[in-house]
Design a protein with these regions (language model features):
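Non-cytosolic coordination micro-motifs
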Residues: 1, 27-169
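Compositionally biased P/S/T/G-rich terminal and signal peptide-adjacent segments
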Residues: 1-28
Length: 169
């Protein structure tokens, strides 16, 4: 949506909402919001955006890992990307999946979760649950914005948390 709404203290140029239907049968599920990507104009004061995000989420973490929902054809690896804090890149994360998944049900969760996360296997499940977070936020601008954004942006993503809620049903 092209917009000039104010988010995190600055006017935006575009806000994109991504929805996903987690019901694998398609019979009863409704799409749920899993990600919001916010693009800011070139002249936006991204230091203000970062400070406003710090008010909401606390200090930036040193790094976070996000897992993509898509793989390249023929690629069976777990598609992951690690974002490391820099002058123009701040990152936040919620609880790790390992902290919320009951240890006595880990195998059950892993078996079901494989249908939701490309490249996830028994071999990488433990590492995945340690690094994946219920929700993440990224504020990237200037030289750090590409390739996530074409320019200044914020990304709020909660796909793992949504899958967790679906699997625990």
């Amino acid at each position: 949506v092209d917009t000039e709404t104010t988010v995190f203290g600055e006017k935006t140029s575009r806000v994109m909402f991504q929805f996903i239907n987690l019901d694998q049968t398609g019979a009863t599920g409704k799409p749920v919001l899993c990600e919001v990507d916010i693009t800011y104009p070139d002249d936006a004061d991204m230091d203000t955006v970062k400070k406003e995000m710090e008010k909401s989420y606390g200090s930036s973490k040193d790094s976070i890992t996000r897992y993509e929902l898509y793989q390249s054809l023929g690629d069976d690896q777990l598609p992951e990307y690690t974002y490391k804090k820099a002058d123009q890149l701040a990152v936040w994360s919620g609880e790790s999946l390992k902290d919320v998944i009951p240890s006595d049900k880990s195998t059950e969760y892993e078996t079901t979760w494989e249908a939701y996360q490309p490249g996830l296997t028994t071999d990488n499940w433990e590492s995945y649950t340690e690094q994946a977070s219920m929700a993440t936020a990224v504020c990237a601008y200037g030289a750090e914005a590409f390739p996530m954004f074409e320019k200044n942006g914020v990304s709020l993503e909660a796909y793992p948390g949504l899958v967790y809620e679906q699997v625990k049903k």
